[in-house]
Amino acid sequence: AFAFSDRRLKRNIKRVGTHVLGVGIYEFDMAGYRQRGVIAQELEAVRPDLVKRHDSGYLMVNYGAL
């Protein structure tokens, strides 16, 4: 399933690891919660098929396919 993962929506971003695809894994604040995941802009550079643009203009990641 796709979920919002655009860098512009995240605050207090801290890199905590590296995904097997070579992109960073981050902890960040988004939508009022501390979360963990990738940044869509980084993932789009290596796997554009896992990223789509929402009607709002923000990028979403298919976390189910990661």
Which residue stretches match the model-derived regions?
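C-terminal intramolecular chaperone/autoprocessing and neck/assembly modules of extracellular spikes
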Residues: A1-L66
